[in-house]
From Swiss-Prot:
This is Uroporphyrinogen decarboxylase. It catalyses: uroporphyrinogen III + 4 H(+) = coproporphyrinogen III + 4 CO2. It is found in: Cytoplasm. Pfam families: URO-D. Homodimer. GO terms for biological process: protoporphyrinogen IX biosynthetic process from glutamate. Belongs to the uroporphyrinogen decarboxylase family. It is an enzyme of class 4 (lyase). Keywords: Cytoplasm, Decarboxylase, Lyase, Porphyrin biosynthesis. InterPro entries: UROD/MetE-like_sf (IPR038071), Uroporphyrinogen_deCO2ase_HemE (IPR006361), Uroporphyrinogen_deCOase (IPR000257). HAMAP family: URO_D.
Length: 370
């Protein structure tokens, strides 16, 4: 499998803690409902899953934000719940209700029936990865992704999204043995799923631990982080083009556990808006010439509802909070990838996103020229 050479490798260089001319950026959920062209494609597809399972449509919507904004990476258009769906739990999206599963995993029998899914059931995802990588034609790198074992387990036990995580936490505290069995299957499934995305052409992969932050201290390390480690240990290190594949881990609410996360086997840690980038850099960013992790984040997505000049001011504050950019091209050092602290809201005005992108690129360039 061969693809066009990469023209803009700024994102990958920052993942590798190499100096870049500006701070690269992409946005979580950058292909989505805030774009009128996305809504038009989704209407053609008829449903969210109709969109995600159709290679042509998934390719089209992945590229839409790049046509509008000079972003530095594309991310596969899919959903974290494709993996439990392939396990036979029956995923559906009701209009205005969000995802739900026909079957939930709540007792011994349910857990015994769980297995790493036949990856052929997810062929549509891998075909989309290859199709998107071809369509990008080397413009920017393509990021593949999955939910974390813990975050998937939350949906699998609750049967849908939850406000209080009552069912999954009840299982975790009353039958930790069952919880560990679910998480072990999930970790092996996620690793196989991400490896198949790498084989299909993904140039970086990201684990979304969206619900890790709801766990108590101690439980986070045992039930979330431990299984994210199990995923990372199994991931392929080299992509189809012979290049290394950076691994990004994002735990929403995880900023309080940076001491625990600094040693996990990944290249990039994502942060939400509650974390301070400069403090995170001091804990995990490393020194020039030494080991460390790149940081990704972390502006509050709600900043995008403010007028463009306020957006630009908040962008500058985030870039300043990271501190002096790494500029020595001869060695590695602390680097930053600009992103939101969580997914972009469907109500975001696209012109405010344009202001954000312009501010990130412009101001981060000026910081390197001081």
């Amino acid at each position: 499998m061969s693809f066009a050479p990469l023209q803009n490798d700024t994102f990958l260089r920052a993942c590798r803690r190499q100096a870049t001319d500006y701070t690269p950026l992409w946005l979580m959920r950058q292909a989505g409902r805030y774009l009128p062209e996305y809504k038009a494609t989704r209407a053609k597809a008829g449903s969210f899953m109709g969109l995600a399972t159709n290679v042509e449509y998934a390719t089209e919507v992945t590229l839409q934000p790049l046509e509008r904004f000079p972003l530095d990476a594309a991310i596969l258009f899919s959903d974290i719940l494709t993996v439990p769906d392939a396990m036979g739990l029956g995923l559906s999206f009701a209009e205005g209700e969000g995802p739900r599963f026909a079957k939930a995993v709540r007792d011994e029998a349910d857990v015994a029936a769980l297995a790493v899914p036949d990856l052929d059931k997810l062929r549509y995802v891998f075909d989309a990865v290859t199709s998107i990588r071809r369509a990008l034609n080397g413009r920017v790198p393509l990021i593949g992704f999955s939910g974390s074992p813990w975050t998937l387990a939350c949906y699998m036990v609750e049967g849908k999204g939850s406000d209080d995580y009552r069912l999954v936490k009840t299982l975790m505290y009353s039958r930790p043995d069952l919880m560990h069995r679910i998480l072990a299957v999930n970790a092996d499934a996620v690793a196989a799923y991400l490896n198949a995305q790498i084989d299909a052409g993904a140039q970086a992969v990201m684990v979304f631990d969206s619900w890790g932050g709801v766990l108590a201290d101690g439980c986070f390390q045992q039930f979330s982080l431990e299984y994210t480690r199990r995923v990372l240990a199994q991931l392929k290190r080299t992509g189809v083009d012979g290049q290394d594949v950076p691994r990004i881990v994002f735990t929403k609410g995880g900023g309080i556990w940076l001491d625990d996360m600094k040693d996990i086997d990944c290249e990039v840690l994502g942060l939400d808006w509650t974390a301070h980038l400069g403090k995170a850099r001091a804990i995990v960013g490393g020194q020039v010439g030494g080991p460390g992790k790149a940081l990704q984040g972390n502006i509050d997505p709600n900043v995008l509802f403010a007028p463009p000049e306020a957006v630009a001011a908040q962008v500058r504050a985030v870039l300043d909070s990271f501190g002096t950019p790494h500029t020595d091209k001869t060695t590695t050092g602390p680097t930053h990838i600009f992103n939101l602290g969580h997914g972009i809201s469907q109500f975001t005005p696209p012109e405010h996103v344009a202001a954000l992108v312009e501010a990130v690129h412009g101001y981060s360039r000026s910081l390197r020229q001081r």
